[in-house]
Every structure is written in C-alpha cells, then in structure tokens.
Amino acid sequence: MKSFRKLLHYLKPYMFFAIIGPLFMVLEVAMDLIQPTIMQHIIDVGIANRDLNYVIKMGLLMIGAAALGLVGGLGCMMYSTKAAVNFATDIRKDVFAKIETFSSENRDSFGTGKLLTIVTNDITSIQSAMTMTLRVLVRGPLLFIGSIIIVFVTARELFPILLVVVPILLLAIIFIASKASGTFKKVQEALDKVNTKLQENLSGVRVIKAYVRQKYEITQFGNVNTNLTKINIRAVQLISLMMPIIMLVVSGGIVATLWIGGEKVFDGTLQVGAILAFINYLNIILMSLMSISMVFMQIARAFPSADRVQQVLNTEVDITTETNAVAPKRIEGQIDFKNVSYSYTKNNEYVLKNISFNICKGEKVGIIGSTGSGKSTLAKLLPRLYDVDQGEVCIDGINVRAYDLQKLRASIGFVPQKALLFSGSIEENLRYGKEDATNDELEVAASSACATEFINKLEDSYQYHLTQGATNLSGGQKQRVSIARALVRKPSILILDDSTSAVDAKSESNIQSALRTEYKGTTTLLIASKISSIIDADKILVLDNGELVGDGTHEELLEQCEVYQEIYLSQGGNLHKEGGKEHA
C-alpha cells in the first residue's frame, strides 16, 4: 500500500481530469438513485389511479434521468481514463528511463523477464486500479450510502432487512478479498517465470532448432505455464466464490422483503411500489458492494505491482557520474590497469585476478585466452559497464570512475561479441554511433568495416530496413555493420570483442588494414580466440583463468608464454609474421 501511495504523485499533472471525472459520476449516481423512486410513483400513483398522463409524464422523467445518467457516465469514463492512462504512461516512462541508467549488475539482479513484466503487466495493473478507483470507487460508496438513506426515509418498515443483509454481505466480501489479495503476488511471480522462459526461447530459437530440442523446451514452458495456470485458477476461484455467496444473501433479503412487505401491503401500511423500489435499492446496494469489492481486488492486485515498480525506481544505480567528474575535450587513449580484480558474484570468486598492464595511445593490442579466461570482462571495465572490485582502471592517467560517464563512453567504440543491431534502416543503426554524422562519415566507416560492398547491393542501400535482431542480414554482415557503427564516432579507444568471428578471412584482413591506416591514432583492443586475428598487433595480452600470464609480441610470447604456445600449437603451429602479413 505504501508503494502505491508513493506513485500517486504521478497523478498531480492530471488532477483536473481526476477531479472532473468523478464529478460526472456524481451526476450518474444521482440519476440512478432517483429511478426506483420514480418507478414507485408510477406504480403507486399512476397505475393505481389509472392516470395515463401521470404515467407518461413520469416515464418521460425516467428517460430524461437515464439520458443525464448516460452523459455523466460517459464524461466520467472519458476523463477518468485520460487521468489513469497518462498516470500510467508517466510511470512507464520513468521506469524505462531508470532501467536505461542501470549498470549491467543492476540489470542482472532483476533479470530481463522480470523487467519486461514490470514495464508491461505491472504498470497495466496499476493503471487498471487507478481507472477503477476514479470511476467505481466514487460510484460504489455513493450508491451504497444513497440507497440506504432513501430506504430509511421512504420505507422505514423494511429498513431492518438491510441491517441484517448488509453486514453479512460486507463480511463475505472482506473475507474473500483478503484471501485473494495474497494470491495476486504469486500470480505476478509466476508470470515473471513465463516471460523469462518465453524471452529465452525467442532469442535462442535457432539453437533450439539446431539441437532439435523443441519438445524439451515445450515441456519446460509447459511447466512454468501450468504453474501460472494453477495460481490463476486459485485466484479466480476465490473471486468466483463471491458471486454465489452474495446472490444467496440478496435472494434471502428479497424473500424477506416480499414476506414482510406483503404483510404490510395487506395491512394497508405499505404500497406495492414501495416494495418494488426497496428491491431495486437492495439490488443497487448489492451492485455497489460488488463494484467496491472489485475495486479493492484490483487495488490488492496492484499493490504487489507497485512494490515491484518502486523496487526499480528506488534501485541505487551503482555506476554513475561522480561529483566533480572530469570531462576533457578529448580522451587520448592511454590505458593502465593497476592490480585489477573483479567478481560478478561479489563472493571473492574473481574472474579477473590482480591484472596489471599498460597500453600506449594508438597501440593495437590483442587479447587472447581460453573460453572463460576473462577477456570480455576485462574489456567491459573500460567503459564502466562494470566497476572493478579491487585496483584501478585508468585512461590518460585518470581513474575511469573520475570521468563524466557520458564523456567516457562517447570516447570508446565498443563492439560486443554478439552483434546487436536495432530494427530500422542501416543508416539509423550507423548513426547510433554518431547522431550527427555526415553521409561521407557513414560511408568511410562502412568502407573501413568492409560493409560498403554488401550495403550497396541491397535494394535500398543504406535505407535497407532491418528486422528485429537484424535477422535479414547474415552473421558476418551484422558484425561489419556493428564495427562500422563503432568507427563512425571516431573513438579514442576501440574495443573489438571477437567481433570478426563470422567475417571471412579476406574481409577481416581488410578491416585490420583499415584500422592500421585510417585509425592509426586510435587505441585498439582486439579480443580474439584465434591467433591469426591478432598476430600483427603491437603487443598481445594472454589471459588464463582470470590471470595475466603473458604480455608481448607474437614472437616474444612464442618464446616465453606456455599458455600462448599451447594456443598456437592447437591452431596449427605454423603461423609466422612476415612483412605484416599472416601465412600458414
């Protein structure tokens, strides 16, 4: 409840809509409340006295009241919906903006599936609760209180029936609502698991098909889906239990009304119209209590969602720009790692252990090692995708923590292992690297990445539309566009994290040549699993089990580093450097 209350400040800009909507609802409620009384007069006066003119006059009054009620209902729906939708839109906007500031560790702590559920289902649940609050939470109590007052004034003889029926209805609704509210939190948690499994399958569909694991994945999805179904059924059963109980109580009230009211009619102390009006008001009370209970159900469902939204909004982002941050006009690109250690789990299981090295401005440095040796992790420390646990990472002699974060990252071109392109044109993807890049700059970057040839062959060239995940490009094409996107910003530091693994040997050689000539002032880190990709680097760093075990040129490492020798032999053992070219 506290979390939901904290979100109410998002409603402030839309208070006009939030106030005017319920005011329209007051009009609708007033019209609903007078209709049973009008019907009572039609029966007791018009029909009893056979006064057709009176019946027509009161009938027209009923139609007018219904029309006014319709206007009130439509006005309430329009303004309340505007308030609730804008309220939810602003929350969603802030949640998304907060997620965008998350470090990799922050995102890992939530998981992609949970974040997707929060941004979609949870905020939608909060929106529904707000809509029902503005529309129904005003209508329900007004109908309830108004009906009781009218019955007390016009049919006091039948009022004791309400004193019995209403408390029973309230107790039944409160009991069922309290039981159901705890189930909704479990529903959201189960939905998280379904979303996570679905997201994994959609992103890994090629692997699943390649290994013929569709049946296994269907079974796994079936398990989490069945769990969600069971919890949903439990929640629905509790809510469904409400209607039969309420109808039973109300039916008992109607029977009591007909019994007691019938005797009063025979005695001449009550008229038939009053009994029918009382039954109508009893039904209005029933509907008002049901609507109030549904609002509280929805609010109870929104409380866990609000908790999860607040969990995102209140998350302390662990990688931010520090006070008095350094923002030089240009970062030169000298890199120093000083006794750097890092652990993903923060339990002293370090994936990088006491790493120290230095790279001069403009050097081309290869980084190699077996799978899991820490190559990619090391590269992610430079743009502060993660922060070190021990030691320092310095650029131009300044700790990366001291830099303005945007300035630091704008000076680094990062090409990850998996080429990630966004839906849209190739040009839009290239401009992701530099929004104000000229067409000439785009073409130079594409040419350096050996992407020009295939781009020009596409139907719309640079305007060629990429599908989600760029599935309409090959792996090598995606990697080349990804490299071009990094090059277009002319970075001080370029990180290629095994970014040419799907590129043919000739294109890879041309890319390496372009890096040596067109970007010779750029400090370049070439992370690779193949020696052939880094053999011409100014120096090579060798990682093994998170430790730096080699630092030197290809020839020096062949003589001095046992791990490098093993990698060299495993890849043919006949590579040599001659005239800047690689031979086998």
Where are these regions (language model features)?
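Membrane-integrated ABC transporters
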Residues: 1-34, 39, 47-61, 72, ...
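Transmembrane helices of ABC transporter permease
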Residues: 13, 17-30, 62, 69-71, ...
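An intracellular "coupling" helix at the cytosolic face of ABC transporter transmembrane type-1 domains
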Residues: 13, 80, 101-105, 121-130, ...
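Alpha-helical transmembrane segments
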Residues: 28, 32-36, 64, 69-84, ...
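Short intracellular "coupling" helices and adjacent cytoplasmic loop segments at the cytosolic face
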Residues: 49-50, 85, 93-117, 121-123, ...
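Helix-loop-helix
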Residues: 51, 55-57, 150-164, 234-308, ...
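ABC-type nucleotide-binding domain
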Residues: 328-584
